[in-house]
Amino acid sequence: GWRTTYGLTSILLSIGIIPLILWLLRKSFLGQQANSNGTYIVEKTSTSIMKSWTRGEMLNDWRFYLILPAVVAPSFIGTALFFHHLTLAEAKNWSAVWFTGSYWVYAVGSMTASLTFGPVIDRMTAIKSVPFFLMPKICALIIIWAFNDPLWAWAYLLLLGLNVGMTYTGLTSLWAELYGPKHLGAIRSLIVAITVLASALGPPVMGFMIDTDISMGNICIIFAIYCVMATIFIFVGLRSSKTSVKRHSGS
């Protein structure tokens, strides 16, 4: 039963995953010590080229407020959808067992995007590639609006997973490229707080829409329109980011 599943999972985390993480971190730390001289010079040189923005400076940057709607979209919409997935399945006449049993497709999508989007960012930079990260979510929402066949649940979950993988990989790189590495911890802590708040607001907002008799398909198309608008905003915000960052670093 579910108790056995939770128990086995906790045991696996205790005796398998946590020791593996500690071993990998120790190995990484030893590797950094072995190459401390060369690594330090490279990091110090690259940091000195680009001035790092403080959190306060970021909050005074107009680009941040154009990027923010796209940043909160995965947390707000994703949490809302997962919270109401049984309602979604009922609205689409999908078996709840079939739908929830297909979550592995979501995991495959998330893992695939996490592993592939990083190299894309390395080649293209986050400023050029991140504006596309909401495209899978837009397609997933359109699927819910347009199709009823249960097989479309796999495409929907796969696209949601792709969006999540691209989000976690891309946004961290984006903040480093836009605002530098020195104050990245302070900047990330603010972003995480905002996205957590968005996650908390998503389910009740979607629940209110359901209670006001807005169909699941129409809710998803509303979310899709929001994501399209957020994508336009982030394109505008990042279009001149290279020159803006250079101007700031030179001042």
Model region roles, listed by residue range:
Residues 1-11, 208-226:
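A membrane-interface helix-boundary motif in multi-pass transporters
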Residues 128-142:
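Structural signature of the two symmetry-related core transmembrane helices
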Residues 56-114:
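Extracytoplasmic gate region of multi-pass secondary transporters
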